[in-house]
Amino acid sequence: TLFNRLTGANVLSKDMLFATLDPTMRGMFLPSGRQIVLADTVGFISALPTELVEAFKSTLEEVVQADLILHVHDMSSDLCSEEASDVSAVLDDIGIDEQSRDDHLLHIFNKADIADKAVDIPFIQTGLNGRTIKCSALSGSGVDDLLNQIDEYFAQRDADCQIIINPEHAAASAWLHQNANIVESRYNAEGQHIIRARLSPANKARFHKHWPDIKARNT
């Protein structure tokens, strides 16, 4: 439901085992205009039969590669804390250790509209790494704050870079205009394209992978 609310998609959302077997990905824009890809993975469960464990983990490749992990907690569940522990155990199993979770995890406490008003969540948050936010995917309450937090996360990690591109690498210029926040764009007397841009760590790595001879130097 939260995935649909954020992306405007109409993906199957049911409280049942393996309602979605494969990750679903959709592009979306954050309040700043930054474009990201949001991936919705198969739900995490405990006591999974041994013969299904590896198949289950193989669907979580997007989690390992993600710049930011959104851990959605069901505030209305009596087992919210236990379910959070199950997710943490799976993250450990697929190689996302506690240090990585400190840097790349946002805890979203969903269903705030139907959670028992007599039950608060500080005890659940105690010991959890990362950032936290409370919202309701159904009513939309808190969703704007969530989007702003995601936006702020990426903005804080961006690097301000200067890239000098020779004429024969016009594709690199086009890629930057699609994947970076362009601050300045000009040409020098030699016909080189000089771009000042803000790049996320992931996009900076992707740029170097495609064009290893072009340096994106921090300014």
Residue ranges: model-predicted function:
Residues 23-27, 34, 42, 59-65, ...:
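Short, surface-exposed, charged/polar-biased interaction segments
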Residues 13-15, 30, 35-39, 47-50, ...:
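Extended hydrophobic-aromatic, low-complexity segments
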Residues 1-68, 73:
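Conserved G1/Walker A P-loop phosphate-binding module
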Residues 1-8, 78, 89-219:
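C-terminal-of-GTPase-core extension/linker across diverse P-loop GTPases
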Residues 24, 50-63, 72-95, 99, ...:
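Conserved catalytic-core segment of NTP-binding enzymes
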Residues 17-18, 36, 74, 84, ...:
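Residue-level detector of alpha-helical recognition elements and their boundaries
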